[in-house]
Amino acid sequence: MLFVHEVHKVDGRKEDEFEAAYRDGWMPLLAKGDDARLLWYANHAHGSGVSYQVVTITGVRDGAAWERLARRMQQGDLHDWACETDTYRHEVTARIMLPVYWSRIQDVDFDTVPTDGSEHELSLFMEDTGWPYVPIDDYIKMWDELYSQPITRHAEGTGTVSIDIQACFQNAFGTGLRREAMLWQRIPNPETVLHLLTHDLDPEMRKPGTYMYDSLEYRDQWESKLLRTSKWSPLY
């Protein structure tokens, strides 16, 4: 399965129209077939970064389905929708991503993805994108061994989940930077993020043998986005 990750710079005066285009247009239009589904629609929380930025992730069954979807956007039944949606945003950048070998999400059963716009509580995600100076495979392995596995063991030992790592993706060939990968993490308790924002990192957490120290052998540059799902986002 392919995952199309898009970052939309929305016209602030037309944010409602843009959201409606995805809720009332893109989502139900994809639901008419079996090639793709809108999975997540999330707003970059105001006060935490760039204004009026929306992140969407669309699941696409395979490469052939992606080509059919691209042709529909270029000259088929989705062309008018795409042209109208462009009037609600300044710019959109996209990359096709693949789940890494240890990602919990490898594919999605489209039959389980809601497409009716039903509303639910909001949820908070932290999207971490990193750019290693080592081979991308080494970086992905490090994320598993030094980050994901310890978090899982901590959750199993305490019975609490502070960070729910739902997926890890890397860019597919020809669609973005070679050495780039992304963590898609749900934050069950926003207090987790609040603590990060309001406290210095404990020196004990920066010593050799800790994730924050040892991971510097792989990269020292990454970007974190705090994203809040819409009340109708299919997954949340």
Put a short name on every predicted segment.
Residues D16-W40, H46-S51, G59-M97, E145, ...:
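An amphipathic, aromatic/His-enriched active-site/gating alpha helix that lines ligand/cofactor pockets
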